[in-house]
Regions:
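Glycine-rich active-site loop/strand segments that organize a redox cofactor
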Residues: 1-24
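A short alpha-helix-loop-beta-strand transition element characteristic
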Residues: 15-18, 32-49, 89, 173-176, ...
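Short beta-strand to alpha-helix junction loop
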Residues: 16-26, 63-79, 91, 153-161, ...
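Glycine- and aromatic-enriched mobile tails/lids
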Residues: 34, 40-61, 210-226, 237-240, ...
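Conserved redox-cofactor binding core of oxidoreductases
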Residues: 34-130, 135, 142, 186-189
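FAD-site-proximal beta/loop scaffold in flavoenzymes
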Residues: 98-110, 114-128, 133, 277-319
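Flavin (primarily FAD) binding-site architecture
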Residues: 143-153
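An anion/pyrophosphate-binding glycine-rich loop and adjacent beta-alpha core
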Residues: 166, 172-284, 336, 345-351
């Protein structure tokens, strides 16, 4: 426990909440046992003991994994389990639009009120575009991150910051959005909306970051070399790329046991082959990509936001665990611990909830104009390019000012479109991306020292 706690605090660069770190580290093992009982299969050695991996900034082997797709394995087993439960209704192909508060009853809701209530959410059925009103005694945001506000990201297409944006519009407190973690090693040249991730565990297995002429460079930046924390590695790669005028560096696995590599990382091995890269003979071209949002909706030790009956867990929440930089693999542990804590707290008060008699219907004014779809697509691309070019690994005061100015114009255009056009998930996601981008920019402007993932050259 103590080593894990210290590693987390060091990675967080003095901005972790120590009590939250203690809770997650100490409660994590019990939560892991629960998901194993639900069917999650972590890799074991021939003796039947769990294989523990090591990743950047960890001082010991402690990471459970399922080959190179641990997240998928956890999702697979939990979805399978939840489909067996008669008391759970799953709404697939639905898009959360907004949280319902007193605002929708005509009251003025401000961020400094302590009696704001969440009554549920407006949700769009994507099969018929009808907006439903869902009443709830407790609402839990578990919507993930916002990597899609960047042009290059490891996040799936749905990671548009919807939960943070909805909570912010509902007047919940949101903080630490300036701390965006960039994964150092996304496969350069990945196709589609999502960059393919070359797991940190590959470096834990012994792969070495090198320049195009096959020279290691990480020792110049940190004595831990290729296993330094993600913020240090990402910044080092960014520096090497800019100083050499290249768009990527390389990850060298050629000296490793390739048969063992294939067993441990079958997806990575096969994907590299699809791109014409044989890891036994070729170095893997990699570049940093937006990966994880260390900030989010402020929540306490029970996952409660600053809005009554609104909870959050996972990447959407700012629990205080990660501080200025997340320790590799702590995210899955945090999600498990806070999902359990949200449930325990909700269970204590759910029977006392009295729902309002009539939630107002979603206002459907506006006309769909097919000509305007091009504006939505254009503005989405512009937001992603703006964030990638100006609000990336290294920032500056001038870039922050320019991005704020341009985002304001995009925001005004999009809000005008929102007022005159029937709602669509594409328009809803664009609004959310703009809200989240604005929070990242504004909180970056307020940050007056370089910490963890945040680096402003004017503060160096």
């Amino acid at each position: 426990f103590e080593k894990h706690r210290k590693d987390t605090l060091i990675a967080g660069d003095g901005m972790c909440e120590e009590e939250i770190v203690k809770i997650v580290v100490e409660e994590g093992p019990d939560r892991l046992r629960e998901i194993v009982d639900m069917g999650v299969r972590f890799d074991k050695d021939p003796n039947g003991d769990y294989q523990l991996g090591v990743e950047g900034a960890h001082s010991a082997k402690r990471i459970l994994h399922h080959q190179d797709m641990t997240g998928y394995e956890i999702q697979r087993s939990l979805v399978k389990k939840i489909r067996t439960l008669d008391n759970v209704n799953i709404l697939e192909h639905h898009f959360a639009v907004d949280l319902i508060t007193q605002h929708h009853f005509g009251e003025k809701v401000t961020r400094d009120r302590n009696d704001t209530q969440c009554y549920g959410a407006y949700v769009m059925n994507l099969e018929n575009n009808q907006v439903l009103k869902l009443s709830a005694g407790a609402t839990v945001l578990a919507s993930g991150g916002a990597g899609q506000v960047y042009d290059l990201t490891t996040n799936p297409p749905v990671a548009t910051g919807d939960g943070v944006a909805m909570a912010y519009r509902a007047k919940a407190e949101v903080s630490h959005m300036q701390f965006i973690q960039f994964h150092p090693t996304a496969l350069y040249g990945s196709k589609g909306d999502r960059a393919f991730l070359i797991s940190e565990a590959v470096r834990g297995f012994g792969a070495i970051l090198k320049t195009g002429d096959a020279k290691p460079f990480m020792k110049k930046y940190d004595e831990r070399g290729s296993l330094a924390s993600r913020d240090i590695v990402a910044r080092a790669i960014d520096t090497e790329m800019k100083s050499r005028g290249t768009e990527h560096v390389y990850l060298d696995c050629r000296h490793l046991d390739i048969d063992e590599f294939r067993k441990k990382f079958p997806t990575i091995y096969d994907t590299c082959l699809e791109y014409g890269i044989d890891v036994a003979e070729d170095m893997i071209p990699v570049a940093p990509a937006a990966h994880y949002m260390c900030g989010g909706v402020n929540s306490d030790e029970w996952g409660r936001s600053t809005i009554n009956r609104l909870y959050c867990c996972g990447e959407v929440a700012k629990t205080g665990l990660h501080g200025a930089n997340r320790l590799a693999s702590n995210s899955l542990l945090e999600a498990l611990v806070f999902a359990d804590r949200c449930f325990r707290d909700i269970k204590k008060s759910i029977d006392d909830y009295e729902a309002p008699r009539d939630l107002p219907d979603w206002k459907t004014e506006g006309t769909t104009d097919p000509k305007e779809w091009v504006l939505i697509n254009h503005n989405r691309k512009e937001v992603k390019q703006l964030m990638n070019n100006y609000i990336g690994i290294v920032r500056s005061n001038e870039r922050l000012k320019r991005s704020e100015k341009r985002l304001k114009v995009i925001h005004e255009e999009t809000e005008q479109l929102y007022k005159t056009t029937t709602l669509s998930p594409q328009l809803g996601e664009l609004r959310n991306m703009i809200n989240v981008s604005w929070l990242i920019i504004r909180q970056s402007m307020e940050q007056q020292e370089n910490r963890g993932t945040f680096y402003n050259i004017d503060l160096a």
